Amino acid sequence: MAKHLFTSESVSEGHPDKIADQISDAVLDAILQQDPKARVACETYVKTGMVLVGGEITTSAWVDIEEITRNTVREIGYVHSDMGFDANSCAVLSAIGKQSPDINQGVDRADPLEQGAGDQGLMFGYATNETDVLMPAPITYAHRLVQRQAEVRKNGTLPWLRPDAKSQVTFQYDDGKIVGIDAVVLSTQHAEDIDQKSLQEAVMEEIIKPILPSEWLNTSTKFFINPTGRFVIGGPMGDCGLTGRKIIVDTYGGMARHGGGAFSGKDPSKVDRSAAYAARYVAKNIVAAGLADRCEIQVSYAIGVAEPTSIMVETFGTEKVPVEQLILLVREFFDLRPYGLIQMLDLLHPIYKETAAYGHFGRENFPWEKTDKAQLLRDAAGLK
């Protein structure tokens, strides 16, 4: 491959869509804590002065949705009306129903191993050896920039920052290898009383420089810091937010394909979420094993059926063993039936709120990021 540019973006925990994702996953976690077998599909909508939590939930648990919502918004940092959104005074509306019994009869089984998929669909997982976390560099560094924005906002280093922010990083590649960063965009909500010059200098020194490796920056790297010149009105006052609207930010930043299903607010019986996590786990272990430099996995399901309807392995010509052998290894070492992957990745725990900002992949504390099968795969493939 010749020289090319590739761009990925991320958004902060205070972005309206991410507020919605975090509320949905906070509700899910609270329910799973009491009832690991709950069926949860929780959607959230946020706008100036209000939060609407809706969806289908079947559970023996009781949770205080209003309290969970306010606590989540408070932790993000919207605690005063001058930010356009206030955890203490916003209205919280609830519109929760039960999961359809027509779905239940296809999912629930006497033998757990025969648990059917909660819906049809296709899911992708991806890994690449271009970063230490086996993720694409553009999305990895886009996430780290907005994570740093939240860090210096919350620890008081830059107290005039506000919760809403977006980042975008364009990497230069030559023959598939990173040779530099071409452009960086960082837009952050701020208080009224900070001037543009001071903001740009502080963002460069406290957010961008500590995060982006200096060897990838050069005199031709372009920086766009709050390029409109003003970003006081942000969060739900600037835009409404909705669960599941940042699916590329949540995954691979456009470097890999996406099946279209969002993650947040869904319990692990929903293969949109759990099978996408499992596909990442498979791809990451293949790359960690040295069986390919890049790997994309596709799995698909039929509602009510346990076995995947298809498994695909794509290695973009970087495989060290035949792709046909990789597919056999995947089938041998990974149980991709809904119940099997839930057990394999230990998913029936309240671990989801943390996934809802800064990406679901490339963060080592999540079980689907383990590389515990890499050596097994390498040995089975006959590589020394």
UniProtKB/Swiss-Prot annotation:
Binding annotation for ATP: H15, D164, A165, K166, R230, F231, D239, R245, K246, A262, K266
Residue sites binding Mg(2+) per the record: D17
The reaction(s) this protein catalyses: L-methionine + ATP + H2O = S-adenosyl-L-methionine + phosphate + diphosphate
A Gene Ontology molecular function term of the record: ATP binding
This protein's record includes keyword Kinase: no
Required cofactor names: Mg(2+); K(+)
Biological processes per GO annotation: one-carbon metabolic process; S-adenosylmethionine biosynthetic process
Binding note for cofactor: Binds 2 divalent ions per subunit. Binds 1 potassium ion per subunit.
Keyword entries, A-Z: ATP-binding, Cytoplasm, Magnesium, Metal-binding, Nucleotide-binding, One-carbon metabolism, Potassium, Transferase
Residue ranges, annotated region (Flexible loop): 99-109
Gene3D superfamilies: 3.30.300.10
UniProt function note: Catalyzes the formation of S-adenosylmethionine (AdoMet) from methionine and ATP. The overall synthetic reaction is composed of two sequential steps, AdoMet formation and the subsequent tripolyphosphate hydrolysis which occurs prior to release of AdoMet from the enzyme.
Name this protein carries in UniProt: S-adenosylmethionine synthase
